């Protein structure tokens, strides 16, 4: 994948017009196979590898300077200014993340949703490897130790609504998952993403969910090597029409030189908002996302980041 700088262009976000630098970048979308396949452990390659991929050039817009215009329940993602008591080396230790960082994450979530009644942490991933841009190579192993996991290059959404409940059941037991369903509250899934140092290469891009149509999304049932089941979403560049001549209409954004104080919260499912899963033609309130390469940054320090996935009840 590659990218080149182009001119600054005016972008419309709701009723607000902003001037934003634009990159032309190539992203790995999903290309459905002619013959549907049953889920298997190899479906991890649909996120990290070369199978069923469609390389598409898109415009990527820098939010730096107007990041406050993006809201989680309007666009599917939001940036927050934060401070953490965690040192970078603390993220080498799972127990420190769980004991010190998870409470910080809860505080940040409550800044957006002060009415939150319960927060269930589904785990964390610390990334510290080079983005794989040669998709002819096998998918990287998923169970590498901390900081050995590379950024995810495939456009995706972490969980479907049902996938969130499946992961909750695996983490805490089916009884708790069933209790959460039975309470009937609004339930949301998030990825809380933060660099451990300033991002000089392989940044993370996110899509304004208002530019996504339900036909662009493909639910993927997954079976992991340990037998655990899940369900997430891979994304087609143009679900409504297939001709290659029609450009992808997704509105992509990233933050140039995102720092450890620039927290990114990405909504991945929402029982009260993302109703495309239940109703044909319903709203897509989640944000597809993917990492991408910046040319000329090959010698920059490897991107190090942490993401915490959680489910909240309102």
Where are these regions (language model features)?
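Eukaryotic N-terminal targeting leaders
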Residues: 1-33, 314
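C-terminal His-loop and adjacent cap/lid subdomain of alpha/beta-hydrolase
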Residues: 10, 17, 135-136, 270, ...
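Short, surface-exposed loop and linker segments with low hydrophobicity and enrichment for Pro/Ser/Thr
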Residues: 16-19, 67-74, 299-302
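Small-residue-rich
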Residues: 18, 31-56
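Non-heme Fe(II) oxygenase catalytic core, chiefly the N-lobe of the double-stranded beta-helix
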Residues: 24-28, 33-37, 49, 61-238, ...
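N-terminal regions that are enriched for targeting/export leaders
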Residues: 54-55, 65, 310
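Catalytic core of Fe(II)/2-oxoglutarate
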Residues: 237-314
